Amino acid sequence: MVRIAGRELPTNKRVDIALNYIYGIGPWRSRQILKELKVDFSTRVKDLLVGEIAAIREYIERNYVVESDLRRFELLNIKRLIEINSYKGKRHKMLLPVRGQRTRTNARTRRGVKRIIDLKGV
C-alpha cells in the first residue's frame, strides 16, 4: 500500500479518489494536486510510479496542512473560541449548533438523543 501523509491509500482506486482518504484533501484539491504534478486522474494507485508517489507526498507535505496537524489546528481554534468567551465558543461549550441553526426543533445531531421525562413517578 501507498502511504501519504500518514495515511494508507487503497491500491485499487483511482488516484484522484484515493487522495480523498487523506483528511483535508477533497475532490477539488486532489485534482488540483494531480494537475500540478501532471499525473493522470484515471491512474490506479497500484500503477503509480515510485517517482510519482514521492512527488505527490512531497507536494502535499510542502503545500497543505493535512491529517493530524489539521485536526489539531481545528481543535485549538475551538479551544481559543471557548477561552475568549465568544458567542461561538459558548455554543461549542454547551454542545449546541454554532452557525445560527434553530434549536427548537432539528438539532438532534448536535444535542443528542431526545430524552423523554417520565412524570408518572413524580
UniProtKB/Swiss-Prot annotation:
It comes from the Eukaryota. The keyword Glycoprotein does not apply. Its main location: plastid. PROSITE patterns: RIBOSOMAL_S13_1, RIBOSOMAL_S13_2. InterPro entries: Rbsml_uS13_C, Ribosomal_uS13, Ribosomal_uS13-like_H2TH, Ribosomal_uS13_bac-type, Ribosomal_uS13_CS. Keywords: Chloroplast, Plastid, Ribonucleoprotein, Ribosomal protein, RNA-binding, rRNA-binding. GO terms for molecular function: rRNA binding; structural constituent of ribosome. One of its GO terms (cellular component) is chloroplast. GO terms for biological process: translation. Located at the top of the head of the 30S subunit, it contacts several helices of the 16S rRNA. Part of the 30S ribosomal subunit. NCBIfam families: uS13_bact. This is Small ribosomal subunit protein uS13c. It comes from Cyanidium caldarium (Red alga). The gene is rps13.
